[in-house]
């Protein structure tokens, strides 16, 4: 299942955008779930907050990383490697993005 990775509050680095990052992550989670994306069963609330993801910490615009599946799960690995599954992931991600812009 999917989850969102977003930066933690780090004074001098993320403090200017962390609330917007969190809003983006929550909108992505809600939109993807509403579109039928299976949720992660190992990340509570599908939201992981991290201090050590440089690409998230240095951004000055809202940013989030979406992990769409677990390659160690055979069913998810098959979905990720098939064209039909990749279209599903694209649809779910698009639903999350649309939800973010609709909620702004």
Outline where the language-model segments fall:
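Active-site-proximal helix/loop segments of hydrolytic enzymes
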Residues: 1-104
């Amino acid at each position: 299942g999917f989850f969102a990775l977003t930066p933690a509050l780090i004074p001098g680095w993320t403090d200017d955008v962390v609330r917007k990052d969190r809003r983006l992550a929550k909108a992505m989670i809600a939109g993807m779930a509403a579109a039928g994306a299976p949720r992660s069963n190992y990340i509570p609330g599908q939201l992981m907050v991290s201090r050590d993801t440089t690409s998230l910490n240095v951004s000055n615009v809202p940013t989030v990383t979406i992990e769409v599946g677990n390659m160690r799960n055979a069913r998810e690995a098959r979905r990720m490697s098939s064209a039909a599954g990749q279209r599903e992931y694209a649809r779910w991600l698009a639903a999350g993005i649309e939800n973010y812009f609709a909620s702004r």
